[in-house]
């Protein structure tokens, strides 16, 4: 079944957003980011000319610089038109949806938003959790919808549904 809303977003170049601790090398192609996060090739529909920020790399650098434990954050920040951004957490290695808890995702959301230093960019109230197609069955979609009914900003999608939001 999946999402029916296609072409909802247009990816924008992330070079103008300021992120605490970000370097130019943190801007990567979505295909590469997805592959590094464990997305299988047959489901990885994005191209490397579609750019995003690999927040894991930023968080690793911040923790080393500050001599602290690495904070939980989203894996990916995608700039979209009109100075907005989306966050996504890649869970391609996840085999069970029963492990998702609101109290685990909220700190990732807050940490990710807090390292965005650009006042002119605003969060688009969409935190996507990306899963393999075989894990996100209709039964599992219903379970997640029920579990997260109090928080509609969390959206559980497979890579095809996520890709369709942009194409």
What do these predicted ranges mean?
Residues 1, 146-167:
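Polybasic (Lys/Arg-rich)
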Residues 1-68:
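Acidic-basic catalytic patches of nuclease active cores, encompassing PD-(D/E)XK
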Residues 67-68, 78-80, 118-120:
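Short, charge-rich binding segments
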Residues 68-69, 104:
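Generic, well-ordered alpha-helical segments
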Residues 72:
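Beta-rich catalytic cores
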Residues 76-95, 112:
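Conserved catalytic cores of phosphodiester-cleaving nucleases, focusing on short active-site segments
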Residues 95-148:
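Catalytic cores of nucleic-acid endonucleases
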């Amino acid at each position: 079944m999946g999402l029916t809303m296609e072409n909802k977003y247009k990816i924008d170049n992330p070079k103008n957003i300021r992120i605490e601790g970000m370097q130019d090398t943190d801007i990567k192609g979505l295909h590469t980011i997805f592959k590094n996060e464990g997305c299988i090739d047959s489901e990885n529909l994005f191209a490397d000319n579609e750019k995003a920020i690999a927040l894991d790399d930023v968080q690793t650098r911040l923790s080393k610089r500050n001599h602290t434990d690495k904070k939980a954050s989203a894996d990916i920040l995608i700039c979209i038109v009109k100075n907005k951004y989306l966050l996504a957490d890649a869970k391609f290695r996840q085999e069970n949806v029963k492990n998702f808890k609101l109290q685990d995702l909220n700190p990732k959301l807050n940490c990710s938003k807090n390292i965005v230093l650009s006042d002119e960019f605003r969060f688009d109230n969409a935190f996507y959790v990306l899963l393999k197609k075989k894990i996100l069955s209709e039964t599992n979609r219903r379970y997640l919808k029920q579990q997260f009914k109090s928080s509609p900003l969390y959206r559980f999608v497979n890579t095809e549904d996520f890709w369709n939001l942009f194409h």
